[in-house]
């Protein structure tokens, strides 16, 4: 029974995905799942990934051995290669509940838990979070299992929580596909609304009030990243900067 096993993927859950085929791998619908974002959490030793066609995000255990990953036990979570957490579309495992990711989703990542606002939350670019023409950047506070800090709580017979996003920024510029976002140490949100598939094609940064404080700059990119000034790679560039050049880091 699919609903009794949300820790597993139902290969028939995407019956007619945009990848061009009716569920399951291979054939004309070989891109039936379309994973487009992967993030690693070193503290938890876990991996998160997002599926564009499933309209869902997932977490799996990275601490397992190869043998454990092929089973249902082992690793820090004790669940082997099973799905530890999933969010966005409970109908994928035959449960009722809010479909919080109505269509495409991209660039799942953990917000760094280093003192910045909402540290430890998952963050996604929800391409059609409000409507077909309105994207959002959503934060999700995944509920930790009180009996195992490497697992996630789910009430029996209920979908994984929370029932809705924990935080949301409604994008000033939207994109129906691709795209990325990140949370800066000061709480600002970096947004890259991709130019592909008719998107805005800009990148910009907003403060915690939603006011644009950097950009928007034209950027016909699929996914962009904003590195903070303290990043070791940025710091190492300082000796090589032209003395007449100015940047937001070396002004």
Predicted regions and their residues:
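Histidine-/acidic-rich catalytic cores in large beta-rich domains
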Residues: 1-251
């Amino acid at each position: 029974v699919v609903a009794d096993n949300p820790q597993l993927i139902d290969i028939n859950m995407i019956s007619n995905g945009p990848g061009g085929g009716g569920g399951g791998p291979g054939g004309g619908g070989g891109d039936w799942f379309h994973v487009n974002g992967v993030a690693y959490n070193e503290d938890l030793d876990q991996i998160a990934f997002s599926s564009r066609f499933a309209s869902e995000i997932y977490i799996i255990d990275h601490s397992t051995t190869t043998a454990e990953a092929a089973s249902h036990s082992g690793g820090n979570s004790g669940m082997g290669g099973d799905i530890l957490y999933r969010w966005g579309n409970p109908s994928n495992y035959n449960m009722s509940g809010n479909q919080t990711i109505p269509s495409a989703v991209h660039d799942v990542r953990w917000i760094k838990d280093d003192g910045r606002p909402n540290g430890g939350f998952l963050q996604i670019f929800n391409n059609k979070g409000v409507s077909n023409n309105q994207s959002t950047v959503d934060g999700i506070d995944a509920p930790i299992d009180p009996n195992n800090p490497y697992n996630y709580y789910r009430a029996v017979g209920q979908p994984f929580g929370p029932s809705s996003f924990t935080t949301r920024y409604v994008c000033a510029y939207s994109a129906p596909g691709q795209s990325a976002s990140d949370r800066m140490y000061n709480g600002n949100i970096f947004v890259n609304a991709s130019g592909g598939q008719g998107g805005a094609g800009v990148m910009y940064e907003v403060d915690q009030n939603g006011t644009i404080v950097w950009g928007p700059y034209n950027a016909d990119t699929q996914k962009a990243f904003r590195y903070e000034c303290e990043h070791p790679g940025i710091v190492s560039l300082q000796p090589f900067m032209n003395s007449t050049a100015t940047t937001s880091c070396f002004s």
